């Protein structure tokens, strides 16, 4: 299929429109913010999963807390801004910003309470396996002596005691800043004074106390707990009358002016403004005296509905530091990614492996090193004349950046499109941009009004008197660290048509010229939305004409109303719709008369499901060789379809097509051990294997079964276990 022509046959039956009242009702959508909170609930549930080792359960708890922090910094901050501006426009599900805030606060209150309850259970569990977290009152005499010495030499120099009075006003507290508030009385005359101690942000939260012997339990105390033992050293001559910790979250959205002469300088200024964003959430220890609590709230101008009293630990995201303890018995068994055998068959020559035929690399089961190797080989190959590369997020000391710099220093034409608007990575991306420019790379920042989220690399090589192109496109970032824990797909091809399409995408980004002649790829905000809609409508037509019709989609989020409505219409026509949505899903599945043919599941497990795959039956039974199969950087959200540059790439090589459709998608649909079924009300329930079925864990399957396209000669000796779904073995109704 060289183009997108003939997605569906001509309509032969009258259109079956959904009832107009149902189509117009906002109740057909689940609220985006509440759906996200349901997703974070699923993450939190992994912290009570008895199948996970203890420290992995702590990790899931910390992830759920970190997720919630970012939700407030971005989503809640945006809704609060709408309320301040008097905006009453309703969300697709019919709620005003104020109504959404009420529901968010109710849901978050329950979620935060459950996080603390789970932590209390996990803390007891850790104590049972030799990891004990102690409070100041639990410190022994010998431990206090060691803590005192450590405090004096390693913590005391970092602390600045701050008295609060007319000469010393309440200081600025940064977002996520952790602070101890104090009520003090001068020993000499009893004069009261309020004071603060800011906890330093560059040292570990948990202090490990040396054990008497290697067989003794590990005992840890928080840095604030250690500091509380020695407040008299910070405020000599004062007595502590009351104290408590607090933590704030600030608005972290960036406001960028549309007219800007220097984009980098503009972002640097905006980042400075972000650090001083308004307070969105104030977390206060419940044990803090009421008078001191009121003082802190008043000083930070926090409204009552922005204050959360915490009966437990603050900054729960920092519990992830506990996973650094050397206790492999309490963690997942380490997994070492495979390297594609086909690359080894060619002596490590990535270009030769790609020339043989297209290749899909499935991360993290297959190493991201092959992507790095692709660019390193391009940098050192004298026949490579040009490299074009997008960068949205990458790692510290990035080998991707080093390879691009090396190529430029070797005299090759290198263009790097760096997205400055990658949230929370803006400063790092500015740094990479300057480093690359110094190396001679042509750095481009793309569109001011659009984020460039596409994952695309184009290498141009001189071969036999002409130029050949090698393309990498994927579903995940060029980030070696996250590639070890995110499941993503890397697609390599030397197909000249894909090469031309990739070149046109780069020209669009660097030259602003809209491409009118892209042959196979689809690009947002230009054609990607319509390509997906055309396919869904095509399957709808197949169903109405009595042919097999199916839509399989895997993504991180499904929010776009037009896509959802098209899926509803497909369901009404009898299309079988299977959706794997890790996070937000605004579609209501299984509603009679609306979506009874739509099933939605979410996979939450050891690895973070991140790949986007879109499959359409094309009038044949799924999975089948004639299906249209795509991978993409885009989720089905308005921001991806309308406000970002994204790429949707078809997979046409038979082996690659089979691997993605019949191995990866089937495994995701088959999974029962890490899957949740989305219910019509937006909540979800854990899936279980059907009666007579063996439980199936897709992550375990891919850790123990090699891929198809990367096997090379080894495929003749052994191939991955073929997967079948229960529905495939049942006769059609």
Curated annotation (Swiss-Prot):
Its cofactor is Mg(2+). Signal peptide: none annotated. Its EC number is 2.7.4.1. Residues 703-733 are annotated as: Disordered. InterPro entries: PP_kinase, PP_kinase_C_1, PP_kinase_middle, PP_kinase_middle_dom_sf, PPK_C_dom2, PPK_N_dom, PPK_N_dom_sf. It comes from the Bacteria. Keywords: ATP-binding, Kinase, Magnesium, Metal-binding, Nucleotide-binding, Phosphoprotein, Transferase. Belongs to the polyphosphate kinase 1 (PPK1) family. Catalyzes the reversible transfer of the terminal phosphate of ATP to form a long-chain polyphosphate (polyP). This is Polyphosphate kinase. It comes from Nitrobacter winogradskyi (strain ATCC 25391 / DSM 10237 / CIP 104748 / NCIMB 11846 / Nb-255). The lineage of its organism: Bacteria, Pseudomonadati, Pseudomonadota, Alphaproteobacteria, Hyphomicrobiales.
